[in-house]
Amino acid sequence: MLQKREKVLLLRTFQGRTLRIVREHYLRPSVPCNSPLCPQPATCRNDGKLLSAEVTHYVIPDWKVVQDYLEVLEFPELKGIIFMQTACQAVQHQRGRRQYNKLRNLLKDARHDCVLFANEFQQHCYLPREKGEAMEKWQTRSIYNSAVWYYHHCEDRMPIVMVTEDEEAIQQYGSETEGVFVISFKNYLDNFWPDLKAAHELCDSIIQSRRERESESQETHGKEYPEHLPLEVLEAGIKSGRYIQGILNVNKHRAQIEAFVRLQGASSKDSGLVSDILIHGSKARNRSIHGDVVVVELLPKSEWKGRTAALCENDSEDKASGESPSEPMPTGRVVGILQKNWRDYVVTFPSKEEVQSQGKNAQKILVTPWDYRIPKIRISTQQAEALQDFRVVVRIDSWETTSVYPNGHFVRVLGRIGDLEGEIATILVENSINVVPFSEAQMCEMPVNTAENPWKVSPKEEQERRDLRSTHLVFSIDPKGCEDVDDALSVRTLNNGNLELGVHIADVTHFVAPNSYIDVEARTRATTYYLADRRYDMLPSILSADLCSLLGGVDRYAVSVMWELDKTSYEIKKVWYGRTIIRSAYKLFYEAAQELLDGNFSIVDDIPEFKTLEEQNRQAKLEELVWAIGKLTDIARHIRAKRDRCGALELEGVEVRVQLDDKKNIHDLIPKQPLEVHETVAECMILANHWVAKKIWESFPHQALLRQHPPPHQEFFSELRECAKAKGFFIDTRSNKTLADSLDSANDPSDPLVNKLLRSMATQAMSNALYFSTGSCAEEEFHHYGLALDKYTHFTSPIRRYSDIVVHRLLMAAISKDKKVEIKENLFSNKNLEELCRHINNRNRAAQRSQKQSTELFQCMYFKDRDPETEERCVVDGIIYSIRTNGVLVFIPRFGIKGAAYLKNKDGLVISCGPEGSSEWKPGSLQRSQNKIISTTAGGQSVTFHLFDHVTVRISVQPSRCHSDMIRLEIVSNKPYMMPNTELCHQSSLLLKSELVKEVTRSVEEAQLAQEVKGKVIEEEHQEYRQTKGRSLYTLLEEIRDLALLDVSDSYAM
């Protein structure tokens, strides 16, 4: 029987008035306790996650402990934690959405032994707040009362420890109830977890940081920054148009002086601004940090500044102070922060000399973040000297108006500076990637496929699915060595003479139930993360590399889209969607499929499925397969031509493919040939994605997950147009169609790299393609600019993209004949889907950044130990693709590197080239025009560098103790190093990349072995960062089609 109570809430309006609101509050005789000791599990309805039965006690943190020590409670060693609803609501109301979401994710994580107890809805636990009672006292009293009830509910069989920071509560409740202990959190760690050193260090760091924060607030100092405006003033100002809301983006090359606010939401439509807002200097930034959602006030036009066009080396000073900036742009100052983007930051402690300069007895240390865009952070620690050579993680606690720098606390050690594992861990933390091995609870949900217990198609599925095993020739075309085959194709002639085209995708959703442990984990990861030498799978390998991989000769579940096409025009007559059973006949690799398409049948000997066939049967099978590949290619040509007529773009993408041996070791790197079968497979996938998008939108117009690609801002094309003009080309950017036609015609027969670079610039100008919920967007905004399609989604890679899993469920619900209620209930509402899309978009950006950063790490490690003065491989050909006021940007086709080459050095000397092209530094000046830059010495000698000139470049590494190492480019001659873009150069470049990986990996292994021999190996907690270990830098390119040209939908972030 429910009991009704009234709950009084005091809410503050935008105008500052306080409103008293009374709401109904219902109490229940039972709520889920989630304990295995529950005497009445049916009554409590303990259907979800249960506490471990192996713990010696349960621990209940009060509201203050949850607020201040949540990161300690995240340690997996701490088990049997019961979070009371009262404490969770305190976090939500007092610490904001970010920490509250962190707590929610902790509760959902199957790896952490913690549960939520809704004490405020349990009639015996709920205590009304007494008149005049402080909120904090009521919260503590309510949590203690709930702890006592929980102890008795479990029939006094499990001691309960309530941890609190309230000394009065410890004195009052410490010995009140036998079996319920009330102690401080510090005492709890000392008594129950004395050997958990990392937790003690983190707890001490938090306590020290809190004490200093409290002491600083009592001291009076001169203000370094103005106060932020109250929330109600900010919201009113945004509504009236006086203030502008946006996301702060700090320029990593000028982190101290230059940041931009990208307009967000209504601000972008109402302000009338077409460009970002410049925030010049740290004072105008007013304690906001890169990624914060800020509120900006525009300065008068007389105070507007321009962005600097000079190259800069990520130093704290303004290196371009003597350079002329670009034309003034809207400039403003931050007046408030709506949402902080504080996260874990990887930092480096100062060297001994720097520590001494801060004071001998100073416990407050300024640490330097790995990310240039983050300001130095002041932390308190006595371990500064011991941790000088390590990368460590810190968190920001506060940033007062009286402090130049934010205050934070030490969290944990990652690894030694320069050590491969430490640097990889740094990349993961910096991109908020926290991927640990799948838990036991998650793996228990997985199917079994062993020699003793092989997986088989179930009779029930045979009845409900369309069986294609004996009626369709199904085959896959993938890179060599690919194991996670998530798509296959088929084509056949129907009885009426028309054709049937089929795209068959692994049926991941059959094995991943909605809201199961593995589904929640996959949703959290959102994507498979591919780093340079390893990957972190979204799903366990039993699915990604086995039961959901459409391998040849085995039965597999699939979700298929099949079209009936006109036999001559290939116009689509009708389409069928559904679940199928397939048995792929051939697992082809691209080169073999292309050889068959070209009529070179000697490649048959390399196709395993043909080796065991008799000659007569072999010839018949070969003719059948060749016909299918040819027909698929012909269909794909027609589909592509139709999209081309609508303005589909072909932009610059990845151009390398790895060739692996049977043991998955790297064998060779070969040039990425523009094979037609790449386009064939890509067009079939795009077609499937397009038709599935139309289907799920028709069925769920307000809650379908689609992918939009907005038209880019025209101002982003300015550099592309200027560069093309330098070569005599005109780029029309008014639409995707005119842009595509212009790029196709911008070819220099003497230098193919020109078109390659122009397409690369067009890629840089593109907006990001994003997932969205159709209920949150007008239909005219659904359009995909790059693919020239009115509706598009991702359906074809559910093994490595959670978005595709959502789309599969939408499609299944859309075609369900009986419209089962449970199918619909598992779909996301528009609001929840939009939130999920934001999460997936964020995780996709993190995946892209981490992959790029890890590749750059290996490049630097390769060149770091080479002498650039004597090593032949360090001198290469480069092509200039952009002019700056003090240098040029250069592309190195041999290694695929882009970077800055200075024409004026730190001493103010300019580059001078002799008759043979060799360079040296002399006093002089630089004169820049639109498509060239002239270096003139004091003696009157001059050298001119034009856009698209080929120059000889020396590659070296600029080491950094606090940040990542960087590739440094230096022009050593204004003459080409060799004939530009020859096949020999291109091929040798790929071979060198192979050597890069091997040498870096070998060097790391040798260094680790040497450390072990000396007995000086320092134990580092980095195993949590390693999951699926790769064998080479480019193994990932073999395993993920998203990064290769064959998946046109993703080659330019579509």
Swiss-Prot record:
Its cofactor is Mg(2+). The keyword Nuclease applies. It comes from Rattus norvegicus (Rat). It is found in: Cytoplasm. GO terms for molecular function: 3'-5'-RNA exonuclease activity; enzyme binding; exoribonuclease II activity; RNA binding. This is DIS3-like exonuclease 1. The gene is Dis3l. It holds the Pfam family RNB. It comes from the Eukaryota. It is an enzyme of class 3 (hydrolase). Belongs to the RNR ribonuclease family. Residues 365-431 form the CSD2 domain. Component of the RNA exosome complex. The catalytically inactive RNA exosome core (Exo-9) complex is believed to associate with catalytic subunits EXOSC10, and DIS3 or DIS3L in cytoplasmic- and nuclear-specific RNA exosome complex forms. Coiled coil: none annotated. GO terms for cellular component: centrosome; ciliary basal body; cytoplasmic exosome (RNase complex); cytosol; plasma membrane. Residues 313-332 are annotated as: Disordered. It catalyses: Exonucleolytic cleavage in the 3'- to 5'-direction to yield nucleoside 5'-phosphates. Residues 236-313 form the CSD1 domain. Its main location: cytoplasm. Keywords: Cytoplasm, Exonuclease, Exosome, Hydrolase, Magnesium, Nuclease, Phosphoprotein, RNA-binding. The modification Phosphoserine is found at residue 989. Catalytic component of the RNA exosome complex which has 3'->5' exoribonuclease activity and participates in a multitude of cellular RNA processing and degradation events. In the cytoplasm, the RNA exosome complex is involved in general mRNA turnover and specifically degrades inherently unstable mRNAs containing AU-rich elements (AREs) within their 3' untranslated regions, and in RNA surveillance pathways, preventing translation of aberrant mRNAs. It seems to be involved in degradation of histone mRNA. Residues 465-816 form the RNB domain. The keyword Membrane does not apply. Its EC number is 3.1.13.1. The lineage of its organism: Eukaryota, Metazoa, Chordata, Craniata, Vertebrata. GO terms for biological process: mRNA catabolic process; RNA catabolic process; RNA processing; rRNA catabolic process.
